[in-house]
């Protein structure tokens, strides 16, 4: 016997029970985004490597360590499986000139790929829902992004904590960068290897260190908030006012910098400790320079992305798991006339919008009823030769104590829809 081939480590199959929960989540998300006026866009999972190097930053963990990159043997191009969705979205917006008539509210969903060490809630293929608001410069759209997240959390029955910061504008970041380098140079003897490597190339990333020893050093590091110019400070103050007016609680975290270089001004994360170690379930902010950086005309932009696997795990801990859709009916049938009529009945019920499983494989009524119950359908629609001859069906509730009833096929539609 040949050896079984397993899935790639960190890339998981989504089996039917899990897929049911995913579909329920996706239906909630689609309706939520529709209510806020966001429109879906879909981009390829494979992009030119240069897109991510330019957008995310070459001195980042994602680009340096985590991307799945290969050379296309046909033409020698370097290609990468997308590690995140914003760069691809902005590339598509520029390529198709979507901002020609004003701002756009867009969203995407799909798999992303990072070569990380697999662990709970962190996989090499993972899935995100992302939102991009392009062409809007004010703090009001920043607030909208955060408020809409809070609305979704309420609908899902979860309560992550909002952490908020601002990265200011270019001048503030440059002044802060100089002070960070001087600070860390003065403590060079206690810097870990990663901080030593980033000291002159990207010192802001040191603030994002997960090393406890570095976190203690970072607690005393110069604050970017102290370097803000009036315009950026007013933007941040206005955002906080809008959040308070909408009843959104938040914590200011001056060490929150995000792991991608394209962010400026507002950055935020929704975090939880309900999945063990504190983890981020949603993160975003402004990236006003990214459109121009990728070759488009200058345009402000903001957005966020949320991890579907982590959100579903968090929903499971809330005590309000997403209830998957189940079939409306399972058709049980036996007898030559009944078998033929069962096909007609299934087509009629499905044509009326009902979800129907038609039993296949024969067997006794008893064995078929066991399969009907296992299907989690709400009703068994039972057809014997006697029912078929009369163009009728027997409808038996599989949940609760209601009695079985026999009705005309046309009436069965109304019966199943009302129940």
From Swiss-Prot:
Molecular function GO labels: ATP binding; histidine-tRNA ligase activity
Any one GO cellular component localisation term in the record: cytoplasm
Localization (cell): Cytoplasm
Pfam entry (one): HGTP_anticodon
The keyword Aminoacyl-tRNA synthetase is assigned to this record: yes
Catalytic activity entry: tRNA(His) + L-histidine + ATP = L-histidyl-tRNA(His) + AMP + diphosphate + H(+)
Keyword annotations from UniProtKB, A to Z: Aminoacyl-tRNA synthetase, ATP-binding, Cytoplasm, Ligase, Nucleotide-binding, Protein biosynthesis
InterPro entries: aa-tRNA-synth_II, aa-tRNA-synth_II/BPL/LPL, Anticodon-bd, Anticodon-bd_dom_sf, His-tRNA-ligase, HisRS-like_core, HisRS/HisZ, HisRS_anticodon
Quaternary structure, from the entry: Homodimer.
Family classification: Belongs to the class-II aminoacyl-tRNA synthetase family.
Listed HAMAP family: His_tRNA_synth
Name by which UniProt lists this protein: Histidine--tRNA ligase
Organism: Thiobacillus denitrificans (strain ATCC 25259 / T1)
Upper classification of the organism: Bacteria, Pseudomonadati, Pseudomonadota, Betaproteobacteria, Nitrosomonadales
């Amino acid at each position: 016997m040949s050896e079984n081939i397993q899935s790639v480590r960190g890339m998981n199959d989504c089996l039917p029970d899990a897929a049911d929960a995913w579909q329920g989540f996706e239906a909630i998300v689609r309706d939520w985004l529709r209510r806020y006026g966001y429109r879906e866009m879909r981009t390829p999972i494979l992009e030119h490597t240069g897109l991510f190097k330019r957008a995310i930053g070459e001195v980042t963990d994602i680009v340096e360590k985590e991307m799945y990159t290969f050379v296309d043997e046909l033409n020698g191009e370097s290609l990468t499986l997308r590690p995140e969705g914003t760069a691809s979205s902005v590339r598509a917006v520029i390529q198709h000139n979507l901002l020609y008539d004003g701002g756009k509210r867009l969203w995407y969903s799909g798999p992303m790929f990072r070569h990380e060490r697999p662990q709970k809630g962190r996989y090499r293929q993972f899935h995100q829902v992302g939102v991009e608001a392009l062409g809007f410069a004010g703090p009001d759209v920043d607030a909208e992004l955060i408020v809409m997240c809070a609305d979704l959390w309420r609908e899902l029955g979860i309560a992550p904590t909002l952490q908020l910061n601002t990265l200011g504008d270019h001048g503030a970041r440059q002044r802060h960068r100089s002070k960070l380098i001087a600070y860390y140079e003065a403590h060079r003897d206690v810097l870990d290897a990663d901080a030593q490597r980033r000291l002159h190339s990207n010192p802001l990333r040191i603030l994002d260190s997960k090393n406890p020893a570095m976190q203690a050093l970072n607690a005393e590091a110069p604050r970017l908030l102290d370097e803000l110019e009036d315009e950026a400070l007013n933007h941040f103050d206005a955002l906080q006012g809008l959040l308070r007016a909408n009843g959104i609680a938040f914590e200011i975290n001056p060490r929150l910098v995000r792991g991608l270089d394209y962010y400026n001004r507002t950055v935020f994360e929704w975090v939880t400790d309900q999945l063990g170690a504190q983890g981020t379930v949603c993160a975003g902010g402004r990236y006003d320079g990214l459109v121009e950086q990728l070759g488009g005309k200058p345009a402000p932009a903001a957005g966020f992305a949320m991890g579907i696997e982590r959100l579903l795990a968090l929903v499971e801990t809330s005590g309000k798991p997403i209830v998957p859709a189940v079939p409306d009916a399972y058709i049980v049938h036996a007898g030559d006339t009944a078998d033929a009529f069962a096909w007609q009945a299934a087509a009629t019920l499905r044509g009326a919008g009902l979800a129907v499983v038609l039993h296949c494989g024969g067997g006794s009524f008893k064995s078929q009823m066991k399969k009907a119950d296992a299907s989690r359908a709400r009703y068994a629609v039972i057809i014997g030769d006697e029912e078929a001859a009369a163009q009728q069906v027997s409808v038996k509730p599989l949940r609760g104590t209601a009695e079985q009833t026999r009705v005309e096929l046309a009436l069965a539609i109304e019966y199943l829809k009302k129940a």
